[in-house]
């Protein structure tokens, strides 16, 4: 056995003779080091989770902004009110608008990256301009302005619908003579009238005749007279059943029957399948002239062109003017002077 081999055996012998408890002394330091690394990793994970939790909390706050949500609801309601009168053809537009609302809601949310940057400013009660409760003040202004414009357009639509309703009532079968006269006189003034040197409205004889002809043609049209005449014929029938045999009407019963026959003929003309305004106008005009010459009828229909009673007295009552008023005779002169001053 040489010297090197002997030294090796000595080392082995020393190792075997060493106290076994000393072999574990280094282990706590290693475990402590490993535990420190593990704890550091766990702490980092907890810190990351805490940051994520803070971000989610702020994000949730941003998504639950009551003011912005209220604006969105108002915006949808105003759009629904604006579109409700336009029929089913706007269903596609309504869906598109709902998509737009969803897009606006998404745009209002602050991105997650901005949340992480804004957490420190929120915790420190920063007063800098930026995101507050997850919504941008500039974005709120855009939504608010859009809502105001939508309300303004809704008011314009309501006004337009009201005007269209009035216009449809004028153009329908419920036209009254006052509306027809007003429209025709306006047209006459706009197209046929001229101003004289004294700044007074003047019409030539031919122009006046044409204007009167237009008025008469319109007043004798089916559009104006059919419904009143039809109602008058029906009321005549009821009146004859109730009063035809009364002695008090014996003297005028013949006149009333002739009036009934004229009204019945006019209604029958209007109900012809081949009715033509130009073709039957002359006959209707003749019947109306005869009906007027026969005088008052026993029918008190509000739509009847031959209302019973003194129309002059009714007019004075409406105007609250006493027929015996001495100043009434100067009314024409005052009206003439007023027109000249205008």
From Swiss-Prot:
InterPro entries: Pex19 (IPR006708), Pex19_C_sf (IPR038322). Gene3D superfamilies: Pex19, mPTS binding domain (1.20.120.900). One of its GO terms (cellular component) is peroxisomal membrane. The modification Phosphoserine is found at residues 62, 304. Keywords: Cytoplasm, Endoplasmic reticulum, Lipoprotein, Membrane, Methylation, Peroxisome, Peroxisome biogenesis, Phosphoprotein, Prenylation. It comes from the Eukaryota. Residues 41-54, 331-342 have a biased composition (Basic and acidic residues). Required for proper post-translational import and stabilization of peroxisomal membrane proteins (PMPs). Acts as a cytosolic import receptor for PMPs and delivers them to the docking factor PEX3 at the peroxisomal membrane for subsequent insertion into the membrane. Acts as a chaperone in stabilizing or maintaining PMPs in the lipid bilayer. Directs PEX17, a peripheral component of the peroxisomal matrix protein translocation machinery, to peroxisomes. Stabilizes VPS1, a protein required for peroxisomal fission, at the peroxisomal membrane. Belongs to the peroxin-19 family. This is Peroxisomal membrane protein import receptor PEX19.
């Amino acid at each position: 056995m040489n010297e090197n081999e002997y030294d090796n055996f000595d080392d082995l012998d020393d190792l075997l003779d060493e106290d076994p408890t000393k072999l574990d002394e280094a282990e706590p330091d290693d475990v402590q080091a490993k535990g420190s690394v593990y704890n550091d990793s766990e702490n980092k994970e907890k810190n990351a989770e805490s940051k994520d939790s803070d971000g989610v909390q702020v994000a949730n706050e941003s998504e639950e902004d009551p003011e912005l949500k209220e604006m969105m609801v108002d915006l949808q309601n105003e759009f629904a009110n604006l579109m409700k009168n336009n029929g089913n053809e706007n269903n596609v537009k309504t869906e598109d608008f709902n998509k737009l609302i969803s897009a606006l809601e998404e745009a209002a949310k602050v991105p997650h990256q901005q949340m992480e940057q804004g957490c420190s400013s929120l915790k420190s009660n920063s007063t800098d301009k930026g995101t507050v409760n997850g919504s941008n003040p500039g974005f709120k202004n855009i939504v608010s302005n859009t809502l105001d414009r939508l309300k303004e357009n809704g008011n314009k639509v309501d006004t337009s619908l009201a005007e269209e309703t009035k216009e449809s009532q004028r153009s329908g079968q419920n036209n009254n003579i006052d509306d027809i006269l007003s429209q025709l006189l306006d047209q006459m003034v706009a197209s046929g009238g001229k101003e004289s040197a004294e700044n007074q409205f003047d019409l030539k004889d031919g122009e006046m005749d044409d204007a009167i002809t237009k008025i008469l043609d319109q007043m004798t049209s089916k559009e104006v007279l059919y419904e009143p005449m039809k109602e008058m014929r029906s009321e005549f029938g009821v009146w004859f059943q109730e009063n035809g045999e009364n002695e008090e009407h014996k003297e005028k019963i013949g006149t009333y029957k002739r009036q009934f026959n004229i009204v019945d003929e006019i209604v029958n003309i209007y109900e012809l399948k081949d009715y033509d305004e130009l073709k039957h106008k002359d006959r209707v005009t003749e019947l109306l002239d005869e009906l007027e010459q026969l005088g008052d009828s026993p029918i008190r229909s509000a739509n009847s062109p031959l209302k019973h009673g003194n129309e002059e007295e009714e007019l004075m009552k409406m105007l609250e003017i006493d027929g015996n008023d001495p100043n009434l005779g100067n009314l024409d002169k005052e009206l003439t002077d007023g027109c000249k001053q205008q």
